[in-house]
Amino acid sequence: MSRVHPVASAVIAVALFSLPSPLARAQKPPTMAEFLSPGYPSSLVSAKKADRLAWVVLDAGRRNVYTAAGPTFTPVRLTSFLDDNGVDTSDPSISDDGAIVIFVRGHSLNRAGWGANPSSSPDGPERAVWAVRTAGGPAWRLGEVTAPALSPDGRIVAFSRDNLIYAYAVVPGALPPDIAKGEKPLVKAAGSNGGLKWSPDGTKLAFVSERGDHGFIGIYDVRKRKVTFLAPSVDRDTSPTWSADGTRIAFIRRPGLPFGQQSQAGSAGIGNPPGVAFGAPGRGQRGAEPGAPAGAPLATMPGLYSSVFPGGYRVSFWVADVASGEAHEFWHPAPDDPVFSAVNAITWAGDGVIFGAEPGEWLRFYTVKVDGAAAAPLALTPDDGFIESQAFTSLSPDGRTLYYCNNLGDIERRHVWKVPTSGGEPVPLTRGEGIETYPVPVASGKQVAVLAADARRPQSIGLVPVSGGAPAIVYPALPKAYPIDAMVLPQVVMTRAADGLEIHNQLFLPRDIKPGERRPALVFVHGGPVRQMLVGYHYMWFYHLAYAMNEWLAAQGYVVLSVNYRSGVGYGKSFRAAPNTNARGNAEYQDVVAGAKYLQSRPDVDPGRIGIWGLSYGGLLTSQALARNSDLFVAGVDLAGVHLYGNVLDPENLAFKSSAASAVDGWKSPVLLVHGDDDRNVAFTQTTGLVQLLRARHVYNEVIVFPDDVHESLIHARWLYTFDRMEKFLDRFVRHAGR
């Protein structure tokens, strides 16, 4: 049973890089288990009306929910899931008063609706929502769920299943008995119903009812058990967002689908003849009328294949009065606008709605007043600096301040900023050597909680004054085993690819390297490819682990270069969308080669002992390196990589020529392959097929397969096993290459 578990940790009001350095820790080479000894926090949330936080911790495979309340913010473990069994814990949500936290146990479903079962439990997997009281007591299971929505008062969890809306009662009596256990629908309506948004007082639930060619915004009244639709039309309405007082809803409206984009089965009704009436969206076809000549020309006329509003624009923002259901448009972009026409989500903030758009090199956030006074969106964030997505932003409880993180002025890190949602000059809250992400304001308005890290401190929960300053760390306290004084500060080095493009890299140099020594070296290539490695611990779990791995490799004596190749993020849209990458020409591989040649040029690197490793897209580039340049790379570790683009085997096809499989005849270097066979990101067949190519050419390979596991293994023990195998493999084929 779960209990409240205080965690020994005090607020440390110091900068992240000001850390103790006990000399006793440096007596022997550290292990990866020691590097991973601190718990890894993520999914930070804050109550709106109480100074209380909640988050998820992954600690040696054990996934639990934690909380901390002001003013001391002492961390407390709320749950007791103490097995390294691969059962994920995610999606925490906290009630406005901070009394209830819900969370999901179980991995997300794949396309077949099957959850991950990495421990191969004979009971099979499930994905269920649980609840726990922050005051203490055992967590309890509510039932199976996909994406739960907790009411602000913490009484109800709503969710969609099979296109209908269901609910669980968190508090007894919150729902009628036949609905409270998720067995009978809360709302049984036509179409596909989802996008659930609770009103601020928790008495109403807004939802999107998609109906193919059109869609509605629905409102379910919990007390009256009544559904109403806001200004129903032939158009497609999405992204409902509530005003602070709960009396109005803003939403996005796009034109309904024209005949030429509709797809519907004939029902022999009037205007709907037997057979397929229209083809797939965007492929207008003749109806299935007997005798219609094959290849007959399609009709052409305005409004048949594309749809616009009067005035020529394709998207508009509307606001509705919830009581009356009446609505009106309050803003639309110019006709054929290429930037704002792509907006698909808005959030009510202050007197307007805010949204993200990418007009140039960087994603920016804008506001439009709901009263319709503004003719054009007002930019809130600058036209420089990388904001990854809306997930890296949050609003103050009153909606008057936007908090976000970006890399403005410090392109290799992230820092937190704030700006009024009515417009004004952005103000930095954090600076310096740290990496601060996912800002979440505390209800009292005095502090902002962040995920914070630096080159030596792993990801932590920190509190920053709203006036700015260094994060005060509340979790985790670093274990004695954590090898902080074995770590190095990565250096930013620039390389130039064969086509002249400059590439940012991080260089990890062993602490004990001596003048005149030539060390073995490794290139690390991240996945994605829309990722950016930083000069410190990363905010994403695998890259947090990969940073620790690169530090560990440096502690083992390797020189490590982490390459931020083109098609990654952090350096602008032109870099992210660089031409001729991926299956269109593999241009990013030039950047990997440039990294290897840079290492070869260093006087402290043995040019004949360079290896490479990476996961996912990093595995893809590892396989490219070994297939195309076994003369540069003596060995590699390829975790869940892609080796053949698409399913075309034509040797003249560009995608095939861009694949590692096309160059496999040049593959001479040994490789360690690691893959889970329930990978939902990269098909396991990519590794199966590659092994056959390598066997046919007598290329040395070692293979680790994790049955029922996913893209990034969910079981800690498997990572430790993988690292042990990697250590032995690299020692044999890189450290001792040619010896």
Regions found by a protein language model. Name each.
Residues A33-R63:
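Beta-strand-rich domains and repeat architectures in extracellular enzymes and scaffolds
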Residues L53, G98-V101, V157, G202-L205, ...:
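Hydrophobic beta-strand positions that form the internal "hydrophobic ladder"
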Residues T31-F35, V76-F81, P138-R141, G182-V187, ...:
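A short beta-strand motif characteristic of beta-propeller blades
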Residues P258, Y313-V315, V343, G350-D351, ...:
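Serine-hydrolase catalytic core recognition
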Residues K48-K49, D96-D97, P152-D153, P200-D201, ...:
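Residue-level detector of Asp-centered blade-edge/turn motifs that repeat once per structural unit
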Residues A69-F73, R133-G137, V170-G173, D221-R225, ...:
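Short loop/turn segments that connect beta-strands within beta-propeller blades
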Residues V56-Y66, F81-D88, V104-W130, R141-E144, ...:
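A flexible loop/linker signature enriched in serine peptidases of the S9 family
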